Structures are given as C-alpha cells and as structure tokens.
Amino acid sequence: MWMIFSGLIVGGLLGFVMQRTRFCLTGGFRDMYVQKNNKMFYALLIAITIQSIGLLILTATDILQIPAHSFPILGTIIGSFIFGIGIVLAGGCATGTWYRAGEGLIGSWIALVLYAVTAAITKTGILKPVMDKINQPTNVNSDMSQTTGIPFWGLVVILTIITIFLVVRTLNNKKVRVAVPKLKQRYTGIRYYLFEKRYHPFIAAIVIGLIALLAWPMSASTGRNDGLGITTPSANLVHFLITGETKFIDWGVFLVLGIFIGSYIAARVSREFKWRLPDKITIRNSAIGGICMGFGASVAGGCSIGNGLVETATMTWQGWIALASMIVGVWTMSHFIFVRPMKKVHQQSAKVKQQTQIV
C-alpha cells in the first residue's frame, strides 16, 4: 500500500507542477539552438543542483547510499542522441509525453504508447541483442568522484557555483521586454496560485528539484534504491499489461501513473484539458519520435529525467555525457524541422524583394 501511495504522490506532484509551469526540456534544448535562449537549460541546472545538494546531505548522514556503477559510454552517446532526435519529433521528452497525454493531446498518446512499447521490446524483446551489441564492449566507471579524485561534495560545490553564476547573470540581464496583454484573472486565492498563475522557469526548477530529491527516500523505502525514472517503469507497465505478472509492478510504475494523474487534474481544474487530434504530419512524427525515444533511452540507460536530471545529480559521467548527447540530438533534428525551413523562407522573401526592386 505504501508503494502505491508514495509513488502516486511523488508522480502526481511532478505531473501537476510540470503541467502548470509548462516545464519542457525538449523546448528548452531546442531554444538553445533555434532562439539562442538558455533559460530552460539553466532551470534544469537549478533542479540538478538542488537534488545534488540534498543527496550530499542524505549520503553524508547515511540515510541513503548511492552505489557506484559502470556505464556503456558508446551506448550512452548513441542512445541519447537518438533519444534527442525522438523528443523533437514527439514534441516532448519522456516525462513531457506523460504529462501532455494527461492534457488530452492525441499526438502525445501516440508517442507515449510507442515509447513504452519500444522500450519494452528493446530491454527484453527482439531488440535486446541490438542494445547488448552496442553496449557490451564499452563499459567504463561512471563515478566522477572516483575517476577525477574530486570528492562528491567538491563536485557539488563546483556545480552550485556554476549554477548560481549563470542564474544571477540571467536575472541581471536587462533585455527589452515586449508588453504582452494579460488575460482577465479568473480565480482568486489559492486557486489562482495553483491553477492560473504562470511561474518563472527558475521557480519551477526549484520545486522540481525538491520533488526529485523526495523521490529518493520514497523509492528507497519500498526497496528501489533510485530516484526518478521514466523509461524502465513505462516498459514495466507494458510488460504487466501483457503478462499480468505483478513482478513488473514497482514504485516507478506508480510514479509514471502519478505523473499522468497529476497532469490530468491540473489540466482539468485549470480548464486546459481538451482532446486534440493532430494532423497527419504530427501523427507521423509522434509515432517515429516515440519509437526513437523508447529505443534511445533503453540503449542509453535513461531519458532526460533518468540521465539528464537524476544521474547528473549523482555526479556520474553517464548523466552528463547523456545530457550533452541528447542536446546534440535535439539540435540536429531542430535544424531540419525548424532552422532549415526558416532559412528557405528568408531566402525566398529576399529573392522576391530583390525582384520587386528590379521591376
């Protein structure tokens, strides 16, 4: 009962907060390249930093132990790159797909189902030999503290200093802001703050970092010594639905179900829930994106949450290499979907303008 309750609570909080704050790593990584806007990436660093400080305290007081492990460096790079491509096509990362499904987006449902099914096939099905072939000969020590000689607390201090510097610089950057007309306020009191008010990404990141930290002791109390994770629980849910075997049900499964429920509640009460049927191109992209996400995250040993938020906070090479690789994947696909079409439009506009001047 505790496993069900704690998993749903943590997942519900995460889904609720992400839906209400529109916390989207896919959009953040894309904007770094397309719009030269790093704000969401810095928000991710805030969440990682908060979690890492909390883990430092929990491990120093022997409340929690983070076991060292090796990781497949080639698989992490290749898998994360493919995952990055997939999340652009799908319009959201693993967590983003779960919470957008809770908003009624059919495209996210398509991506979510294929993501979970592909992850299951890759981890235990016909694609497992492919994953093993990529990963087998490339295992190296993932512990940054052991490989660099810098203690865990030292790495946390370095990350904290870098994050504070970037956040302060961003907040002090006085850019000219375009006045955006505000909609009439619908709610008052706590309902306004929970279901209407929009929050700065940095505020959202603080809350998400605390939720990510809370996930560790909650998960450990059920025998799962890990933090937030999306891919394996999603695959386990598929296995359970197919086989009916309860061995696939653990804290992580209730976590992802909680994300969906929390997002649904937030979208319903804030009147943002709506069944939305995408066009044919979006359906195609969502399907391909979901498949890439499931395969890539399985090969890499984690998604934008498992690797990008959790493994980075534990100061592992797997986390930081995966994060860099998935960002490159996002940039690569963003170039073909957003940047190149925009360049063509600008070139055509310039050509028309030139012809007009000649006439």
Each PLM stretch: what is its role?
Residues 1-359:
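Membrane-interfacial helix-loop segments of redox and metal-homeostasis proteins
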